[in-house]
Amino acid sequence: MSPADQKNWAIPQATHDWVLILDADERVTPELKKEIISLLQKPMEKDAYWISRQSFFMGKKIRFSGWQDDAVIRLIHKKCRYNSVQVHEEIMTKNINIGRLKNKLEHYTYKNLDHFLAKIQRYSDWSAQDHFNKTPKVTFYHLYFKPFFRFIKHYIIQLGFLDGKVGFIISTIMAWGVFLRYVKIQEKQIFNNL
């Protein structure tokens, strides 16, 4: 069962109309808690709310590296549902009115380097499944240029170099994840043609 399927099962089980969806690696700050409580005491004008996340990795608050604009829809009316994908599921936003909260969730996405690498491995499996039918043939472009551009995106364009060594590590591992995705798609294509 994918994370989206798990969440879609859990949402209607809620006894209240509003649900705050949290992943195990997310923490509600006292400021965010106050904002949500205050919001729920008034008539709700929206169907769901974006919440920005402040990520931490290797003991450091990450200010750049592509993680600075990270936001997720987490406070939802129980009529909302997630799309059915294997990785990075999102609330289906068609015909719903979405707001944005001011305060952030704390996001401790990776406990350590081994955890980051294990998660990238798992995400690349799911991502390969999601992209398998969209990628007719894996080419030199997929295996070499897409990972290279992912590194450039995180390290240069999204200012990962300002996060120092940790920014370099994040950018490198994100590029590695793209490489793994396409190697796994290639593997599936080879075995499907046998």
Residue ranges and their predicted role:
Residues 5-12, 18, 22, 29-192:
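Catalytic-site signature of metal-activated, phosphate-bearing donor transferases
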